[in-house]
């Protein structure tokens, strides 16, 4: 048998190592556990016992990722039990879609191999798909990617009529964008966050951190979310840039991030677009893609001066 040259060289020149990205750790068992608990809760007439069922059958035996998701989004057993009863049409419509988690993450190992080539310092992170109560399709805690399956795997068939406003309108737009078809990009966006430093502070700091994750996830997957912000942005770029410059140093995020369409733009999450364009324009000027991606990921997002310097280096904002 003829050995590949690099393996033959390793045998001759021991010790020799070949650096590759580790296979991703993906946990999906919480989804099946949720639905068995859901069925039990619907059959239980006593309110206190319904909460106990959620605690005993979903929360306590749940994965570390589920527990992290509940911590980050402040989910409680009582909230789960209440939502299970309150939204039967929603749960019936989303149930079959949550079975797509394995298929939706089928490209993950390949995508992370590309990520590792672009960013050799990539650190491993686990990914957990669990069912939440509609407060995130994806978030992180340390080295854990936490996917809210009831959101991330959805599509236009999801029934939101029972949900309260403004959640109903926001999620109608979100599900109509077919997030389940974009799951590879969503996983990568959150994986980028596990490599970045956290931030608190100004709009600029949050928007750039989100935009870098969007840019890198698109670079790897070739996709970005089919959300209105990406259609709206190019048509209103001058307005977005002017308002961003005026508001970027403040800590008010309501017009820009984690919001609904009730804002001056009439489109949610325009801050993602602003941050994405900053990252995109920065990368256009860089001769060394690997080095530039490392600088973006390793930027100190908690330092407003460092973030301001990055924004200025991008050239995206108009001159005063």
Region spans (language model):
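Positively charged n-region of N-terminal signal peptides that target proteins for export
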Residues: 1-4
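Bacterial N-terminal signal peptides
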Residues: 6-16
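N-terminal mature-domain "stem" immediately C-terminal to a signal peptide or N-terminal signal-anchor/transmembrane
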Residues: 22-81
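Post-HExxH zinc-binding segment in Zn-dependent metallohydrolases
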Residues: 24-39, 200-245
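Acidic helix-start/capping segments at beta-turn-to-alpha-helix junctions
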Residues: 55-62, 126-140, 233, 299-302
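Pan-zinc metallopeptidase signature
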Residues: 58, 245-320
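Acidic/His-rich structured neighborhood in mature extracellular/periplasmic domains
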Residues: 82-222
């Amino acid at each position: 048998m003829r050995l590949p040259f690099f393996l033959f060289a390793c045998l001759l020149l021991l010790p020799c190592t070949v650096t590759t990205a580790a296979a991703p750790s993906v946990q999906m068992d919480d989804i099946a556990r949720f639905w068995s608990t859901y069925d039990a809760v619907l059959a239980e007439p006593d309110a206190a016992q319904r909460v106990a069922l959620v605690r005993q059958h979903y929360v306590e035996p749940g994965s570390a990722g589920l527990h992290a998701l509940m911590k980050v989004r402040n989910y409680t057993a009582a909230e789960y039990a209440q939502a299970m009863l309150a939204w039967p049409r929603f749960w019936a419509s989303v149930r079959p879609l949550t079975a797509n988690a394995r298929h939706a993450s089928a490209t993950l190992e390949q995508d992370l191999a590309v990520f590792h080539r672009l960013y050799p310092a990539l650190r491993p992170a686990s990914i957990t798909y669990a069912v939440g109560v509609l407060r995130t399709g994806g978030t992180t805690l340390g080295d854990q990617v936490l996917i809210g399956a009831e959101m991330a795997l959805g599509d236009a068939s999801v029934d939101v009529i029972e949900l309260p406003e403004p959640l109903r309108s926001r999620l109608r737009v979100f599900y109509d964008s077919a997030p389940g078809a974009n799951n590879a990009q969503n996983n990568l966006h959150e994986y980028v966050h596990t490599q970045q430093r956290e931030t608190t502070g100004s709009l600029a700091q949050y928007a750039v951190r989100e935009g870098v994750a969007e840019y890198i996830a698109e670079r790897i997957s070739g996709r970005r979310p089919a959300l209105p912000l990406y259609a709206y942005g190019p048509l209103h770029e001058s307005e977005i840039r002017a308002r961003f410059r005026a508001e970027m140093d403040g800590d008010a995020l309501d017009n820009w991030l984690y919001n609904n369409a009730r804002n001056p733009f009439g489109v949610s999450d325009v801050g993602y677009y602003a941050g994405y364009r900053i990252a995109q324009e920065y990368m256009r000027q860089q001769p060394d893609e690997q080095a530039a991606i490392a600088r973006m990921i390793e930027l100190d997002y908690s330092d407003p001066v460092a973030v301001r310097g990055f924004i200025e280096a991008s050239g995206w904002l108009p001159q005063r």
